[in-house]
Swiss-Prot record:
Its EC number is 3.6.1.7. It catalyses: an acyl phosphate + H2O = a carboxylate + phosphate + H(+). The keyword Hydrolase applies. The lineage of its organism: Bacteria, Bacillati, Cyanobacteriota, Cyanophyceae, Synechococcales. Belongs to the acylphosphatase family. This is Acylphosphatase. GO terms for molecular function: acylphosphatase activity. InterPro entries: Acylphosphatase, Acylphosphatase-like_dom, Acylphosphatase-like_dom_sf, Acylphosphatase_CS. Keywords: Hydrolase. It comes from the Bacteria. Residues 14-100 form the Acylphosphatase-like domain.
């Protein structure tokens, strides 16, 4: 077996999660932002007028999977009924923020 100088490539993906249930007014955006930053993700989270929360995050598939698991639970006072995921094109964002 030859030893090449190939470096493993890190796959980056971007996903949108629409989070439904009692997810506004319970600290969901703040908790999501903290978790995303802990996972090294970039993107944003915001409340929607219809009561849902929208999350767009970019990073490794493993980190995105961890964020989705967090979104399915949310903070202690949240009652998540459903998370609807969809994959998006990568934008190359550098940070994670809370949008209004």
């Amino acid at each position: 077996m030859s030893r090449g100088k190939h470096k493993p490539t890190i796959t980056t993906e971007r996903w949108r999660f629409f989070v439904e249930g009692k997810v506004q007014g319970v600290g969901f955006r703040q908790g999501c932002c903290r978790r995303a930053m802990d996972l090294g993700l970039s993107g944003w989270v915001r409340n929607l007028p219809d009561g849902r929360v929208e999350v767009q995050a970019e990073g490794t598939p493993m980190a995105l999977s961890e964020l989705r698991l967090w979104c399915e639970r949310g903070p202690a006072d949240a009652r998540v009924s459903q998370v609807r995921p969809s994959q998006l094109p990568i934008t190359g964002a550098d940070w994670f923020e809370i949008r209004s």
